[in-house]
Amino acid sequence: MNLGLNDDQQMLRDTFARFLDSESAMARVRKANEAGGFDPALWQGLAELGTFGMRVPEQAGGLAMGTIDAALVMEEVGRTLASGPIAEAILSARLLGQLGSEALDEVTSGAKVATLAFHDMASQPIQWLPGGAHADLVIARRGDEVILVSLSPADRRIEDSLAANGIGECDLGKAAKTVLASGKAATDMFEAAMEEWKLLSAAALNGLAREAVRLAAAYACERHAFGVAIGTYQALSHPLANFITEVEGGRLFVWKVIHEIASGAATAAAQIPLALWWNAKVANMAAIQSLRTFGGYGLTTEYDIHLYNLRAKAWMLILGDPQRLLQQAGRRLYAGEIAVLPDTGAVAVDFDLGEGAKALAAEVDAFFKATLTPELKAHAHHSWDGHHPHVHKKLAEAGLLFPELSPEKGGRGASPYASFAASSVWEDHGWTGHAKGTTMMVAAMIDKFGSDELKRDVLNPILAGDIVCSLGYSEPGSGSD
């Protein structure tokens, strides 16, 4: 497993972080919002950095960078609320490069703004587009054709929105258009771009959520009430801690999906909409909680947090109800729906737990298949009620109850990765780990701090699978366990 960025990726992230901290500072974001959600100077600066050519194939003059590189850039875009259809322009340029269009140079140079149409224009010629208020070019699908649409002011209708995200309702049927390509190969490229858009949007929402929580945490350290910083109150600090954990999980979710696509995992297609749904949900809820941390100030336009709240709510609505992403994932998992996946390029991060972890997981899986009779399966429950002394004892005898312990103590000396893989198998079989988890906590404390007598009378029976332990309440009135 390797979840670290390589030197080139770290440099890429740092470069865009510095650039956007300067060129998409909140004063610039507010000014762009007044202009309908677009900053021409920022757009040109992004073009000069090579942003729009990063996913263009090398043979078309692009940088041929990977999806994960684009995701890193989009995290910074979300963090700084950078204006314009940036993910859409990156993928539009990729399509133009793949299809050999002469319009590519205009897009990568920043001379023209390009975006994507999400719906087949054959059945829906009029549709809302991300960046449609400012786009010059749109790449759309029309049946088995991929179309390049040139928009004029007469082809669009713009309505002000509180989020100032630059959406526009565009009449693609009326606008001038050119057929870029036709046939399955062309439409597959377009569909792959749509899937990659979901991942890049998920990354942007993740960056937004991370910054919203950071703003709230900083304010909670500065704001005092009753003589102390409000961040010392658990009612404020614990929700923020929960959300930054979910934000971190959202980032790893996006990276893991990219890794799964690159490695050909069977569930990769279903994971794409799930990653977007998760990050959209977390961004919305994290922004709300962060805004509430500011109290009434959070609702005023003077505080930047309200900008994050508005953008978090509006960003995904261009695609429709985010809950539909769950339906799409379900169809891909259980109904055989096929998706065309993007070529992600090289992926340095690696979520593989290793051969040792796979071997231990396979052994635990075989144990449960051999041990869990229909009666035991009926007994299974996710709570303590699912504990069964006989199965608990047999796991201990097989050295699978506490595999992280040394062989001398009845375990396997398993690595944390292997222990995690083994625990996941318990979940797969619906077998509760409550008794195991709490008992292991007590066993670890006794092993480290207990007397010889306590180890003999309590620890040894624990390791043998003869007894289980629970934790008492040290502060019953406060709910601490």
Region spans (language model):
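Alpha-helical interface subdomain recognition
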Residues: 1-80, 99-102, 110-111, 183, ...
